[in-house]
Amino acid sequence: MTGSIEQGSSQTHGNTHILHFLVRLPRPLETVWPALATADGLCGWFGAVDVLEPRLGGVIGLPGLGAGQVTAWDVERVAEYTVESGGRMRFHLEHDDAGGTALRFTHEFQGEGETESRWRARFEQLIRQAERGA
């Protein structure tokens, strides 16, 4: 099984933008979770992480996006981070029929800071990492 990114969608309501992606990863959910829910894991495909307290209400710090909070946390299922300049990023994992993992991603933010192509590039990196077994 190889990973894939299904067509993303974008909505705009005033100055609020919402991006959605469905990413299929060729690894079991238990091995994908650390890539989304640990500082080391996020560094491997998303970018640097100053701090991440892996729990509801925990602190997260992302260079360039600022400090924030873990606003949803369900181990091996949901990690959601809300940061000062980056808005709300939600990672929702599900088992898929092929033995891999389906990642449903939502990013809600203000302004023009993020783009669909930028997230697609990040998810391509995440897929490569998963395919290597990292």
Indicate where each model-derived feature is located.
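Hydrophobic ligand-binding cavity/cleft-lining segments
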Residues: 1-51
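Beta-strand/loop substructures that line and gate deep hydrophobic ligand-binding cavities in soluble
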Residues: 78-134
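Short, intrinsically disordered, mixed-charge
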Residues: 34-47, 75, 121-128, 132
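Glycine-rich portal/gate segments that line the openings of hydrophobic small-molecule binding cavities
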Residues: 40-88
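Intrinsic-disorder/low-complexity, polar/charged segments enriched in Ser/Thr/Lys/Arg/Asp/Glu/Gln
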Residues: 16-22, 29, 65, 78, ...
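Generic structural detector for well-ordered beta-strands
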Residues: 22-26, 61, 69, 92-94
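Short, ordered beta-strand-loop transition motifs
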Residues: 10-15, 53-56, 72-74, 95-98
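Well-ordered beta-strand positions in beta-sheet-rich domains
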Residues: 20-22, 51, 67, 88-90, ...
